[in-house]
């Protein structure tokens, strides 16, 4: 009630309880254009901090009637912006935006025994990886971006050219050639 008495707008959001906090946690946040925390809110009243938000997987879209996928060589395009520019100028495609692309972030997970493994997360090209969300997604692991040493140990992972398929075969995935876990973030 103190926020109301002080005239401060606030939202109660679902939050990550952390390693010691138990299974449920809520935070009181005051919407502001500045600050370090982000949250989402639905018209139906659901509100959650970005690291604690849960969403349903999107419904599968039918590919029936769509043209077959085509692979394009994209030399020198190591960023989403350069892929978009290349697609719009060199390939004669309709107006492509970063939201039409998929980028891959390579994360290193270190467990309590200091065993390090990699995971590749695909997310829409117009979005950034939320560090807190990544930490919550992999409980029990220290999570950080893959290092140059990680890339050197995995020569199949070439910055700017990482994808689930390589040379027509499944490359990413625990049962694929690389044995590197592969996840998609649908939000």
Positions of predicted regions on the chain:
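Extended, low-hydrophobicity, polar/charged segments
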Residues: 1-187
